[in-house]
């Protein structure tokens, strides 16, 4: 027994250090100056690493910052350090680690407290024995894999590591696993597993009111065992606001077996004004657009925002658009959004033949509501579903169509009112080198709410359309970092309907946000799809090139290919069955400091079918200044 006890006393020292190191790991990017990311993507407090490893990390960072080559530790392109977690602890460092202590492991006993350990051993146990509630299945599988195998210092050391990892996979992110002094000659090993309890929640980087708000969003309480799924759900909820980014790291508490949760908040500016320009208009309303607006992200308290935007042509004559959006979280962690808009339209004279022309005026009004419900996800996967209702009162279709491609749509006629309901689902997945977004929703209109929501009113605006309809809309977008800081973006959006739709509900293509090189919404359809592929160069900096003092900027060039194929449901005589457009082009994106953004694209049409357009292509310009 003496030799075994002496050896296992050594194991106790080793495994305590290993468990403390892994217990300090975080599940999210955290305090950059105090942590290091290992090759497995785990964020570890630098202070818990062995002093020699800490020195290697600091030396490697210094070499990388100076651009002097490689340091003593290997670092991959994601900035992850290849760390030997056993370094400095003697793990596997001597041939004695592989010497068998017993020839066969018969049983493993898991205990919650060191005081429960029997120093004289626990003979007679076969297999796995424990008295834990909600015992993770992953841990049981790991322990079972060691039963029946020889026991050495090295295998016990690896057992502790594997158990800690299994606990993390089983929703226990912070545990201490110890092998105290004991007699193992019976073939039974006792492990002390201490599931860490919360000591306190520390919030950094915000004022007192926001600190209290963020802390109250974390449902785990002092003295409770930490569950990764619950903590991650709470963190995801806190980060639902676009004006706040909160990162988390676990740190050892003052008492043994406890853990502090540190929340580091990076507040972004929530209240601002902005103005801008873009050439996104349509025929007879002018292509130029002047934009001004404001956003109040926390004026009414956390998780309440109000935004307003005014858009018009440069002469303030043809289009005057007002839109207002209010968003608020609810106590039961759902979201409610209200959107209201009013567009006043007064066009240039429109030729109607015989040398005559006609002025088209009218207004379009919309009031919409969305009720959003976050669904269970993971650290890198957020899911949400929403219910919605739209009321639209359209008195002029010039806002939605290209005059040269009217097809069977009337510019004006009797007023049409739309009452429709929607059900949607969206998902965002964070990958190691990118992000993917998926959205699908169904829209249904029963029709018959009033005289303007009748088949007759719909027919007068769009031949073959009825007030009762149903259509699906789906989109997928993927952005990815490539080699040497190149990146790519791919997006596709599609739609299908059971009949002819009003112009405001059709899928449009053409313009800076769909198919470049064509005018805005030059093609429309009840069904079809459009897609874009973009390839971006690495960042350039005009500030560095021009040696501008105290200024930062980012300039990227891109090449793209855009295409669309659209069609209508119930065709009129001689109406084409589909409309196709496609283009290639180049562009740039320039962000100056944190207040000015500029985009420029030139698209050249490479194919068109049943669409009237300028085949020489066109530029698309947009700029926004924020104050």
Predicted features along the sequence, with ranges:
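A composition/secondary-structure signal for short, hydrophobic, low-basic-content segments
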Residues: 8, 29-30
């Amino acid at each position: 027994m003496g030799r075994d006890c002496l050896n296992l006393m050594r194991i106790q020292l080793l495994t305590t250090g290993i468990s403390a190191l892994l217990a300090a790991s975080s599940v999210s990017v955290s305090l950059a100056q105090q942590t290091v990311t290992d090759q497995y993507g785990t964020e570890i407090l630098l202070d818990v690493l062995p002093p020699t490893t800490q020195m290697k990390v600091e030396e490697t960072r210094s070499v990388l910052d100076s651009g002097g080559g490689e340091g003593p530790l290997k670092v991959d392109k994601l900035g992850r350090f290849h760390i030997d977690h056993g370094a400095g602890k003697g793990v596997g460092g001597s041939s004695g680690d592989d010497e068998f202590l017993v020839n066969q492991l018969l049983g493993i006993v898991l205990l919650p407290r060191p005081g429960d350990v029997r120093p004289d051993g626990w003979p007679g146990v076969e297999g796995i024995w424990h008295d834990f509630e909600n015992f993770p299945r992953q841990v049981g599988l790991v322990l079972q894999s060691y039963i029946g195998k020889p026991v050495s210092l090295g295998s016990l050391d690896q057992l502790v590591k594997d158990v800690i990892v299994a606990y993390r996979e089983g929703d226990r992110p912070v545990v201490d696993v110890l092998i105290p002094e004991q007699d193992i000659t019976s073939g039974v090993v006792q492990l002390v597993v201490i599931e860490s309890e919360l000591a306190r929640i520390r919030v950094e980087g915000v004022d007192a009111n926001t600190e209290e708000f963020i802390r109250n969003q974390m449902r785990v309480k002092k003295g409770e065992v930490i569950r990764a799924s619950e903590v991650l759900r709470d963190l995801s909820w806190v980060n639902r606001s676009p004006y706040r980014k909160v990162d988390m790291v676990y740190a050892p508490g003052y008492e043994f077996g406890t853990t502090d949760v540190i929340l580091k908040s990076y507040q972004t500016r929530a209240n601002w004004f902005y103005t801008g320009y873009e050439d996104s208009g349509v025929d007879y309303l002018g292509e130029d657009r002047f934009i001004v607006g404001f956003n109040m992200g926390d004026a009414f308290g956390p998780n309440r925002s109000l935004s307003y935007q005014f858009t018009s042509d440069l002469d303030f004559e043809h289009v005057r658009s007002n839109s207002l959006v209010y968003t608020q979280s609810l106590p039961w962690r759902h979201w409610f959004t209200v959107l209201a808009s009013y567009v006043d339209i007064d066009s240039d004279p429109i030729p109607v033949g015989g040398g005559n022309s006609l002025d088209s005026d009218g207004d379009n009004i919309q009031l919409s509501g969305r009720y959003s419900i976050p669904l269970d996800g993971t650290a890198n996967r957020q899911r949400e579903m929403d219910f919605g209702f739209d009321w639209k009162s359209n008195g002029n279709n010039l806002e939605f169509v290209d005059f040269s491609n009217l097809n069977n749509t009337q510019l004006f006629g009797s007023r049409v009112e739309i009452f429709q309901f929607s059900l949607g689902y969206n998902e965002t997945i964070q990958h190691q080198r990118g992000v993917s977004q998926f959205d699908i929703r169904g829209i249904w209109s029963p029709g018959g709410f009033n005289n303007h929501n009748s088949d007759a009113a719909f027919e007068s605006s769009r031949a073959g359309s009825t007030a009762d309809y149903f259509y699906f809309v789906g989109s997928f977008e993927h952005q990815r970092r490539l080699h040497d800081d190149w990146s790519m973006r791919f997006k596709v959006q599609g739609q299908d309907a059971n009949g002819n739709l009003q112009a405001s509900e059709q899928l449009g293509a053409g313009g800076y946000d769909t198919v470049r090189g064509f005018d805005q919404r030059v093609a429309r359809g009840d069904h079809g799809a459009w897609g874009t592929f973009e390839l971006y160069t690495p960042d350039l900096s005009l500030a560095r090139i021009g040696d501008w003092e105290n200024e930062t900027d980012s300039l990227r060039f891109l090449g793209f290919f855009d295409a669309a194929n659209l069609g209508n449901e119930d065709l009129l005589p001689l109406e084409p069955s589909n409309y196709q457009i496609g283009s290639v082009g180049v562009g740039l994106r320039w962000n100056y400091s944190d207040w000015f953004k500029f985009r420029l694209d030139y698209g050249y049409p490479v194919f068109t079918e049943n669409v009237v357009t300028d085949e020489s292509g066109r530029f698309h310009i947009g700029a926004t200044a924020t104050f």
